[in-house]
Each structure stands twice: as structure tokens, then as C-alpha cells.
A protein has these predicted regions:
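Double-stranded beta-helix
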Residues: 152-198
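A short glycine-rich, His/Asp/Glu-containing loop-to-beta-strand
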Residues: 38, 62-108
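Short, conserved beta-strand element in jelly-roll/cupin
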Residues: 103-124
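Conserved metal-binding segment of the jelly-roll/cupin
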Residues: 133-153
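Short Gly/Pro-enriched loop/turn and capping motifs at secondary-structure junctions
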Residues: 11-13, 118-119, 127, 146-147, ...
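N-terminal leader/capping segments at the start of a protein or of a new domain
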Residues: 1-71
């Protein structure tokens, strides 16, 4: 299940809000200018599908969002655990690429998670919002929003990414160390799983 946890940015130990209800997540994120939707998944998409197959399977979603939002570049990002030599190094590099707080300057952050999971953290005002995002979640964050993404130590996700910038993913680091002070992927995922088991 998806999960939203909100903390004061000065206290990562005391959540001010926690919900796994998609409607509540959508409402809470909508209140801070973000978008959250649950979308239908394609059951016939192979687990190891390449980017072209992923885009083809979700062509209707891609076309809808491109038409509505004017995106000019769409790609697929992700990683799947393998026993291939060097995979652990790649996993560390992928996690490190996204885990420091950053913005995307003059572009939005729009991601449709089609497989696996990850945690998006939004630092807006005096609050940090962690969204445990799983397959079927569409998350949209306005340009200039400070955020980070934790793939976990064993990244296992596939996401379709949408851009207004034809250069695709370009980050601007804030220089803050805040991401290291908040519960990481493993902690947030464990909380989501504990709630799911209730």
C-alpha cells in the first residue's frame, strides 16, 4: 500500500500525519500543490520489460498526460536486482544520484511508478512529506519543490518520467544534509508493511 508520513522538518521522530488512504493522500498533497493518483496497472507487462515495452503498455496514460500538461520528453527509469557483475555498484550509484535534496529548477517532477517501490520526500515550508510510492502511483510535484528520492539499498522499481525540459532529468542540489536526518526507505517501507498487516 502507499503511505504518506509528514513530520516537522525540525523533528524526524514525531510524525504529524500518517495515512495510507489514497483519497487522504491525494487531498493532503493537493493542499500543498502536489498531485497524487492511483492508476490501473497492466497485468500483461513482463517483469523485465524494456523501456519501449513499458511505454507501449502505458501509451494511453503517456498520451493523456502529454496532451494535458505539454510534456516534451518522456522516459523510463528504474533498476531490477540481478546477479550481473557490477550490479551492486550500479545500485549504490542510482541511490546516491537521487538521495540528496534537490530541485529541478524550472521543471515539474512527474513520475508514474509502474513496478516496485520507492520513497519520495517533499520538503515544503517547515514540513517533510514522505510518500511510500508503489506500483500504480502517479505523483506530480511543481517546479522548484525541494525533494529527494530513496530507492533503498536494493533498488527495485520502474517509473515513467515526464518532462517539460527536452534534456530530461536535470537536478539542482540544495546543499542541505536534511535527507540524512529522516527515516530512510527501509524504515518507511517497514512502517507501510506493518500497517498493511493490521
Amino acid at each position: 500500500m502507499s503511505l504518506l508520513i509528514t513530520w516537522p522538518d525540525s523533528d524526524p521522530t514525531t510524525p504529524a500525519r500518517e495515512t495510507s488512504d489514497p483519497a487522504e493522500i491525494s487531498s493532503a498533497l493537493g493542499g500543498i500543490g502536489c498531485q497524487f493518483q492511483r492508476r490501473e496497472l497492466r497485468s500483461d507487462l513482463a517483469a523485465g520489460a524494456d523501456p519501449d515495452a513499458v511505454l507501449s503498455a502505458y501509451r494511453d496514460v503517456v498520451d493523456e498526460l502529454v496532451a494535458a500538461e505539454g510534456f516534451v520528453f518522456v522516459d523510463v527509469a528504474g533498476l531490477r536486482p540481478t546477479d550481473r557483475p557490477g550490479w551492486s555498484d550500479t545500485a549504490r550509484e542510482i541511490r546516491a544520484k537521487f538521495i540528496d535534496e534537490h530541485t529541478h529548477g524550472d521543471d515539474d517532477e512527474v513520475r508514474f511508478m509502474v513496478r516496485g517501490s520507492g520513497v519520495f520526500y517533499l520538503h515544503i515550508g517547515a514540513w517533510v512529506h514522505a510518500i511510500y510510492s508503489r506500483a500504480g502511483d502517479l505523483l506530480g510535484v511543481p517546479q522548484g519543490t525541494t525533494h529527494w528520492f530513496d530507492t533503498g539499498p536494493v533498488p527495485d522499481f520502474t517509473a515513467i518520467r515526464f518532462f517539460h525540459d527536452p534534456n530530461g532529468w536535470v537536478s539542482v542540489l540544495t546543499g542541505s544534509d536534511i535527507s540524512g536526518r529522516f527515516p530512510d526507505f527501509e524504515a518507511v517501507r517497514a512502517r507501510a508493511r506493518s500497517l498493511d498487516a493490521v
